[in-house]
């Protein structure tokens, strides 16, 4: 899950809601990556970029979705004088190829990609920074490779459980009924009996006339529910397809993890420091998951509930909490 798809391209894109988001001047300057590359992973070519200071503290930015991809705005969260920031587009996302591809695209594949990327860049350990699905993948990678992680900054916690997916598909719309009506009205009455499978079938259809409208309904629904202040937002094009198709692909496969895998294995990473930042009014990833994670983690985890925010990285309170956490880890 992400919800940041239409927001990362520009802060305060809607002038009526501008004050709800961090001001442009409060982020770090726009900087070009000092290096770009691709990992050859067989069917998949994984795009990555590096920015900031080459000998700075290594941090890996893990985007949401699955399928949301990275944006130049994401680079602006990281102090270029203190961090060596690595960003990458997960399989099927952003500039990685093939776009929207679901074959050989599992959580285990993504974990392996991260580890290959770390080895290729010669990084011993790195800080993991991920929100929404990015928090899921960060946690799954840390559980698989705890010795390679120096700490975690997590936002909008999604633990990849069936209950959370059911909430997204059936209950989130109680708070954003207009967006939910647009989401389910694309399906026939019969198809609404299993929303996930019905959307998955359409999103996997090779014909653009079938998969693209479904993708835009799905991505627009999620993005419209991403902030405390409501706003109907339309997401179109390639980004809508990768986000919707890959989310449905992962959800129909239980995120390729045993149910409750993360909390059942939290002991593996309990020794690592973590900052967990959660919008109190996040309806995409409700606060109960962040609360459960922090409770299971113990005293090495700090949970900060942001009372005046929803799900988006760039909402004012969340963005400032993320910047503060990055300052602490940079010391």
Model-derived features: where do they sit?
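Conserved acidic catalytic loop of the alpha/beta-hydrolase fold
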Residues: 108-126
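Short beta-strand/loop motif that positions the catalytic acidic residue
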Residues: 269, 276-278
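A catalytic-pocket lid/entrance helix-loop region that shapes and gates access to the active site
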Residues: 149-196
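Conserved HGGG/HGGXW glycine-rich cap/lid loop of the alpha/beta-hydrolase fold
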Residues: 40-98
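Catalytic histidine-centered segment of alpha/beta-hydrolase-like enzymes
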Residues: 309-321
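Catalytic histidine neighborhood in serine/cysteine hydrolases
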Residues: 297-312
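Conserved alpha/beta-hydrolase "acid-adjacent" motif
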Residues: 283-289
């Amino acid at each position: 899950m992400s919800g940041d798809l239409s927001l990362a391209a520009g802060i305060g894109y809607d002038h009526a809601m501008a004050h709800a988001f961090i001001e442009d001047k409060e982020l770090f300057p726009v900087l070009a990556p000092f290096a770009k590359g691709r990992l050859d992973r067989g069917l998949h070519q994984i795009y990555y970029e590096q920015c900031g200071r080459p000998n700075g503290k290594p941090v890996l930015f893990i985007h949401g979705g699955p399928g949301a991809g990275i944006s130049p705005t994401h680079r602006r969260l990281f102090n270029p004088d203190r961090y060596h920031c690595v960003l990458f587009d997960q399989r099927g996302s952003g500039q990685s190829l093939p776009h929207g591809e679901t074959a050989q695209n599992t959580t285990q594949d993504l974990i392996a990609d991260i580890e290959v990327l770390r080895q290729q860049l010669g990084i011993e350990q790195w800080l993991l920074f991920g929100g929404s699905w990015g928090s899921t993948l960060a946690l799954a990678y840390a559980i698989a490779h705890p010795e390679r992680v120096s700490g975690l900054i997590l936002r909008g916690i999604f633990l990849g459980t069936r209950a959370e997916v059911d909430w997204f598909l059936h209950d989130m719309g109680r708070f954003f009924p207009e967006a939910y009506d647009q989401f389910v009205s694309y399906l026939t009455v019969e198809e609404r009996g299993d929303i996930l499978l019905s959307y998955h079938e359409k999103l996997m259809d090779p014909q653009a006339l079938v998969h693209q409208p479904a993708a835009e309904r799905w991505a627009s629904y999620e993005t419209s529910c991403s902030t405390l202040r409501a706003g109907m937002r339309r997401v179109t094009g390639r980004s809508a397809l990768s986000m919707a198709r890959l989310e449905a692909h992962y959800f129909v496969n239980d995120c390729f993890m045993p149910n409750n895998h993360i909390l059942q294995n939290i002991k593996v990473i309990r020794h690592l420091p973590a900052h967990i930042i959660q919008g109190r009014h996040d309806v995409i990833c409700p606060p109960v998951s962040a609360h459960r994670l922090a409770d299971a983690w113990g005293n090495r985890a700090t949970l900060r509930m942001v009372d005046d925010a929803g799900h988006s990285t760039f909402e004012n309170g969340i963005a400032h909490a993320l910047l503060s956490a990055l300052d602490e880890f940079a010391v």
